[in-house]
Amino acid sequence: VGMLPCLGSVDLKKAVSGLNLKYGKDYVAFYEPTMARFWYMNESSREKVRAELSNPKYPGSFISGAQKSSYGISHDGGKFGDDIFLLNDGFQVSPSYISRKPFKAVCGYSPESEGMSASFLSTCKPVFIPKTVADFFKLMKSDVEESVRDL
């Protein structure tokens, strides 16, 4: 659970590099195994990247505003990217900034994906039960703060 076997890979960096845009001037991208994050310096860059990656030959889609909200990243001020292109289950970005070669299995697909289920176990009663991935940071932070108070 949490890892899915890889069925294929796509070179998103090559696809975006062919759009006649200047990296650092028109856009910045970060290519991870299951997604690509984009920060745009102008609307034209956004339109070109979105048009290219919306082609069915790229097995994925851009995360919607509603999805960002449900994932707890809608008010991030662009920290996670202006756009996130998330690949479909079983596909990966290769090469990525994590690895030059494809992996046999990858984690980090959509939280709704059947293979991305998880469990939460604790040896003590938590201050609150995490509902999203972002909640785990808050839970760990509250635990550290409590430990520091006890010193």
Tell where the protein language model's regions lie, with residue ranges.
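Acidic, His- and aromatic-enriched active-site or binding-groove loops in soluble protein domains
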Residues: 16-28
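Metal-dependent active-site segment of extracytoplasmic phospho-/sulfohydrolases and closely related
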Residues: 1-13, 85, 120, 140
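Active-site neighborhoods of enzymes that stabilize oxyanions during catalysis
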Residues: 25-148
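Short, surface-exposed, charged loop/turn segments at secondary-structure junctions
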Residues: 10-18, 99-105
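Glycine-centered secondary-structure boundary/capping sites
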Residues: 8, 18-20, 141, 145
